[in-house]
Amino acid sequence: INWKKIAEIGKQVLSAL
């Protein structure tokens, strides 16, 4: 599991809300 990618995607998802 690539936690850095998950963190980046998570930030993008939160900013998209």
UniProtKB/Swiss-Prot annotation:
<keyword id="KW-0399">Innate immunity</keyword>
<keyword id="KW-0929">Antimicrobial</keyword>
<feature type="modified residue" description="Leucine amide">
    <location>
        <position position="17"/>
    </location>
</feature>
<comment type="similarity">
    <text>Belongs to the MCD family. Mastoparan subfamily.</text>
</comment>
<comment type="function">
    <text>Shows antimicrobial activity against the Gram-positive bacteria B.subtilis ATCC 6633 (MIC=2 ug/ml), and the Gram-negative bacteria E.coli JM109 (MIC=8 ug/ml).</text>
</comment>
<keyword id="KW-0391">Immunity</keyword>
<dbReference type="GO" id="GO:0005576">
    <property type="term" value="C:extracellular region"/>
</dbReference>
<protein>
    <recommendedName>
        <fullName>Dominulin-B</fullName>
    </recommendedName>
</protein>
<keyword id="KW-0964">Secreted</keyword>
<keyword id="KW-0027">Amidation</keyword>
<dbReference type="GO" id="GO:0045087">
    <property type="term" value="P:innate immune response"/>
</dbReference>
<dbReference type="GO" id="GO:0042742">
    <property type="term" value="P:defense response to bacterium"/>
</dbReference>
<keyword id="KW-0044">Antibiotic</keyword>
